[in-house]
Amino acid sequence: MKALKRNDRLDVQYIKTDAELDCSKLKGNTDVILLWENSPFGMPSELNGIKDLEIPVISRVTDPSRAKASKILNEKWDIDYYFNFFSESFFHDLYPKDFKYKTIFYGVESSLFENLKPFNDRIKKRILNSGNIGNDKFISKIINDVRNPKWNTYRCKVLRTKCSKLDYVDYTRTLEHNFVSDDYPLLLEKYQAVIAADTYSPIQKYWEMPAAGCLTFMEMTEKNHGKHIGFKDNETSIFINEKNYEEKFHEYLSDVENKKWEEIANNGKNFAIKNFNNDLGADHLADLMQELI
């Protein structure tokens, strides 16, 4: 949000909403409507009159677990274009092929990643794993697979869940520590090595972690559509999967003084800050807006 305000090409007006929004007041003073996301989460239940405006509507794509219920809002909210950091193939696995979509990377607020602890001053012999994990107990997996076969937490975070069980991994849930939101880099700077793992698609952690100067072990598979984010194995990160993750961790832990880890971490930091910063994302969003008006 701050990056949109900083962008010289945009004159942004934030609209505070209640349960319903009268969109008629936007007529005549708005070129583009940008929606927080295409779901009821964080949005008004009704955008009254939005279809009468003849103003382009762009929406950030909601969490994939809400995609099925969000499809009906495409017509109801008259959405012209979608964006997020997902690959186009992943988006169209979830939504109809005629829904227009653009991949736009964002998530690194550059100022939050400045002056962090140097790589060699960080914890070496432990690996950080943070974020939600699933319940891997047999009965729980069966119940969750019946209720929500694909998008339950365990199926979305299989490798992350497995990593949390390793005795050399420090695991913390997202909201069970003091380093949430803008303070997350202050947790990351404690560790040389961290884990970014998601079953179906790379998420914001994949670039926040290297941006903080961490050697980032990234789950990267055909299943999770990860290649589009541009990181390279053994150059800007270390790729892992369910078959090799322990081997990759042991390679690092058995040789923590090897200078190549710092080199990969530094390369990853430079790549993440250059390609995933919020100002670049805002500029790409401005490009999309320009195309539609």
What is each model feature region?
Residues 198, 237, 257, 270:
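Generic anion/oxyanion-binding catalytic loop in active/binding sites
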Residues 206, 214, 240-241, 261, ...:
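Active-site/pore-lining binding-face segments in mid-to-C-terminal subdomains
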Residues 258-290:
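A charged, aromatic-enriched C-terminal amphipathic alpha-helix characteristic of glycosyltransferases
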Residues 1-49, 53-208, 215-229, 279:
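Nucleotide-sugar donor-binding catalytic core of glycosyltransferases
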Residues 241-260:
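C-terminal "capping" alpha-helix adjacent to the active site of nucleotide-linked donor transferases
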Residues 24-26, 187, 248-252, 288:
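CheY-like receiver
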Residues 233-240:
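A short acidic/histidine/glycine-rich donor-binding loop in glycosyltransferase catalytic cores
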